[in-house]
Amino acid sequence: MKKITIILAALAMLLSCNIAKNTAAEECDCVVPGFMLSDDNIEVKVGEDGCLLVLRNKETGHNYASGNGLWRLFYNTHEEKEMQIDNRENTPAISHEGNIITIEYKDLVHRGKALKMDLTLTVALEDGSVRFGSTVINNEPGTIVRELQYPLVGNMNLPKGHKLLTTHTGGQLHDDAIDLIVNVNPKTLYMKPDQYFRQYDLQYPRHAASNCYAFVGESDGLYFGSHDESLQQTWHGLRAYPSAANKFDRLEAGFYRYPNAMCGDTWTCDASIVKPYMGSWTETSRIYREWRNTWWDKQEVPQWVNEMTGWQRIIFKHQYGEYLRKYTDLPGRINDCGKSVGCNTVLAFGWWSDGMDNGYPNYYIDETQGGEDAWKQAISDYRADGNRLVLYYNGRLVDRESDWYKHGNGKKATNKDNTGAEFAEHYKFTGEGTTLGYYDTRTFSIANMANREWRDMLIDWADRAMAYGADAVFYDQLGVAEEFPNWDISGEFPVQDLYTGRYKAEALREIRDHIKAINPEFCLGTEWLSDCTAQFCDFVHIVEFTAEPYSFPEWFKYTFPEVIWSDRCLRDDTDVERRANNTLLKGLVNDIEIFRCRGLIDETPHYQGYLAQINAIRHKYPELLLGAGRFIHTDGFKCSSKDIIARGYANGNRLAIVATTLCADGASGKLTVPGYRFVESSSIGDVKVTANGSKLTIGQNGITVLIYEN
């Protein structure tokens, strides 16, 4: 009895310690003086020192903040770069009026010296969200304010089980944010002060397809959104700081922006939104889409694009002169391959005389194959059999051996670095030796997307594609901001252009408006998924992977169901079922790129046979499983098994549920679809569906589509 009493006492002490630990922050923020904003949903409090004491979801009671600083600022002189200023040396004047807290720093101090730099921060409550604004005024001679990291939620208190949701490649879901950040590529750490922090690099509009991210739980979460119509390149700030040596366990989240304010300049931004919310991750989609609707400019796509299952991406002539396909193959073997898998579209690469990734922007027709007449005839013959032809151009690369670069205005229309020298890119395609890929590579400059002559050429190429008889024009690499933007070196300090994503969006809008005025059925596509550029395109060719364990393309599909985009990297007979199933499950069209566009799908018979089955199901229910079907994730239905992955598509009174499993032993579960009656199902592999559609049993990589009506 005495032993039991001791155990119970110990348990009670342990419980009281845990309660004390969980409530310590709440007690602290109540005691520490500061400035409070509150509505029915959220509570935010800033301390007298300008630190963030409270960021609370009032419904759950959870406080994400820990009393850390809200900002960091970086400036350069001519002698030293990237000097950091933060709240530790600076004391603010804080005021509170209505729903706004204003934090003012006059004459910022760095290393004990007062600078003629002012920073004003605002924290405003707006309908359950917090809007963070900032103004930088620089009057310090010989300086430039390069970067402002704000707002920052440091040493974040994340509820147990909350995952990091980014919009990388349309969506990625990471179980452990700290683990993702800490375990970055060690090669990048060599160049960074990794003893201070670890950082996960993510920018919009580059790998981040939308300008937001979130920490998501089953029924609540914390949303970070940059609601910035300027489309300035923005970093999604994700860092881990150490609580002890080499123990990086303090999560920090925020946004990083780039004022580039020289002496005499003022810069402002009020686009940062942070919102504790209730609901599943889909609430983050609703928050972002509600803002995006204020300037979304997506037009309906032609029916043939809605019915497109994907495309064969094929290189006709390669970079180094090898002919992989001839014009006459288009209505011949290429057509036969497409028909064998239910794909009636070709994305034609390397159709010009110089070959793929060579000669840009010449695009001279290949006279050795019969010239323009032969190419037009091949396209006409291919289209006559019910097919569609998409013509490729590169939207940004300039070959330094091209006529336009050597004899035209090419050198004036390319991006320059911070010394005025041209950036160089190399696309190292190889033959079967080593010389070509490692030594004898093509060198490209990068077109300045603000250049009018370049933009006019893009439009001219669309006209040329229409003249050839193509159905669409495709511009490679126009969906994303530049990694190496143009620098202006005319001022006291060189300044990078952070609006290249906006320029590309403007260029795509010009092309879209031009071609649609001529022929509404003629279409436009690009590579890289970004919401700011996808809105002007009829389809998008993705970059990177969509079927990794952390891949979550559901986020972008749910947020922008009208955008048609592809998978990538399924190019041989390996792991076919899982990856092909993923495209049907997630609503992605197929990018058929056999052997990196060097082969045709009849050279990969396993992939060929399986994709034919996938597309047969798509063609059976095109109004649901192709472009017209609206991706609804799991809205309106439930599956009892966590081992079954089920996703829904709706159109009118009909609903399709696509279900599969990755479990080696298979899985069984019940489907509940209130308000709908089961009609039928179509399956591939080891699948059993009961007569009323309420229960299903699926073997590993089996897949089924269940149809319901109300």
Where are these regions (language model features)?
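Bacterial N-terminal signal peptides
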Residues: L8-S16
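Polysaccharide-binding surfaces and accessory modules of carbohydrate-active proteins
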Residues: E26-E43, N63-Y105, V109, L125-L238
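Beta-strand-rich recognition/accessory modules
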Residues: M36-S38, E126, D194-E307
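Active-site-proximal substrate-binding groove within the catalytic cores of carbohydrate-active enzymes
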Residues: P259-N260, G264-D270, Y503-V687, K695-E709
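An acidic-aromatic substrate-binding cleft motif
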Residues: K275-D357
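The substrate-binding groove and active-site-proximal loops of carbohydrate-active enzymes
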Residues: G310-T328, D357-E372, Y438-M457, S490-K504, ...
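Active-site-adjacent "subsite" loops/lids of carbohydrate-active enzymes
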Residues: Y323-Y327, A374, L391-Y468, P553, ...
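Acidic/aromatic-lined carbohydrate-recognition and catalytic surfaces
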Residues: A348-F429, E506-T526
